[in-house]
Amino acid sequence: ATNAAETVFTTAEATKAKAGDIIHIRSAWPGLDEVIARVKEASESSVTLEDINTLNTGDFAAGGGAGSFRVIKSWEEMSQITEVASSGGEQQSIQLQFLSDTTQRNVNTFKTARVQTYTIAHDSSLPFYDLLRQADSSQDTLAAYMFVPKAKENRYWSAKASFNDIPNTAVNTVETVTATLNLQSGLTAYK
C-alpha cells in the first residue's frame, strides 16, 4: 500500500475488485489492518481506497503497508434490533510531574477498546442467528455495516462477535437476545 491521501493497493495478481466495492483490509500497518473501505478506483493491478488517508509516516511507515484484502460479496441483516449500546473509546492518560516542576500534567496514552451491544427481539428462525453463532464460535473478524437513514450515511467497521442466544424473559415484555460486536477497526463512513 502507498502512503497517500487515498491509499492505493498494488496487487500481485489480477484483482476483480471494482469501483464501489466494499473491501476488508489486512495490512502490516496497524492503523489500516482490519479496516473496511470502499474502492474508489480499480484496475487489473491496483485499487484506490476512498477517504483512507495514510500520509502520516509516523503512523504508516513508508514501505510497510503490505497486506491483502477481500471483497465483501454479501451482507446479512440483523433485524428486529430494539437498542444499540456503545461503550469504550474513552481516552486514558497518565499523570506526570517532574521533580523541578510545580505543575502536574496529564499525558494521553490510549483509548479503551470499543464495543457495540445489540438488543434484538428474539426469534430463533431469523437467518442471522446461525451466522452469529458461527462467528461467536470461530472468532473470525467480520465486516459490519449500518445504514443510518437520517444521517444518509453508510457506516463500516470490523468486529469479532459474541452472541447470547438465550432469551431474556420478563412478564409483559418482548423477549430479547444480545449480540456483542468487539470492534477491531475504527469507523469508516460514506455518504
Pin down the residues of each PLM region.
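Short coil-to-beta transition motif at edge beta-strands of beta-rich domains
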Residues: 12-30, 137-143
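Exposed beta-sheet edge/beta-hairpin loop segments within beta-rich domains
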Residues: 104-110, 132-137, 148-150, 167-175
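Oligomerization/assembly interface segments of phage tail-like spikes and tubes
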Residues: 105-126, 173-188
